[in-house]
């Protein structure tokens, strides 16, 4: 089992140039990157970074959001052998925990900015190809 000890917001950007017209629709295609940082074998914690980017700062997209969040995780042995999770299983458990915190942060950030919050849909970690596994 994986537990998140804390999360740290490393970057948070919101640019809004939406025209207040309810008939205006645009597509939201978030780019999501998840990375597990290397750790020393004697370290009990693992650090993961998650980046979610909506829109682009370079083009004329009316909305741009970028959030980078870091999570500090600890693996807890589930049986008497004390065996910790394999990297692939760690990713499948750590990613949704950090993604949920990021989703909530993005919705809250938009609400504080006076916008209707975007509720990114949950992602099934079993359908993700974690590279490096």
Where are these regions (language model features)?
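N-terminal intrinsically disordered, cationic/polar leader segments
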Residues: 1-97, 104, 108-133
């Amino acid at each position: 089992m994986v537990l998140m000890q804390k999360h740290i917001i490393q970057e948070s950007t919101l640019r809004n140039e939406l025209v207040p017209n309810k008939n205006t629709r645009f597509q939201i295609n978030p780019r999501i990157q998840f990375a597990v940082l290397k750790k020393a074998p004697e370290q009990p914690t693992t650090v993961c970074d998650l980046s979610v980017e909506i829109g682009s700062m370079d083009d004329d997209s009316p909305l741009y959001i970028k959030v980078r969040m870091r999570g500090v995780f600890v693996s807890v042995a589930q049986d008497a052998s004390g065996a910790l999770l394999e990297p692939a299983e760690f990713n499948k458990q750590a990613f949704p925990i950090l993604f949920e915190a990021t989703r909530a942060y993005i919705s809250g950030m938009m609400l504080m900015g006076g916008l209707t919050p975007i509720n990114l849909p949950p992602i099934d970690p079993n359908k993700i190809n974690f590279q490096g596994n």
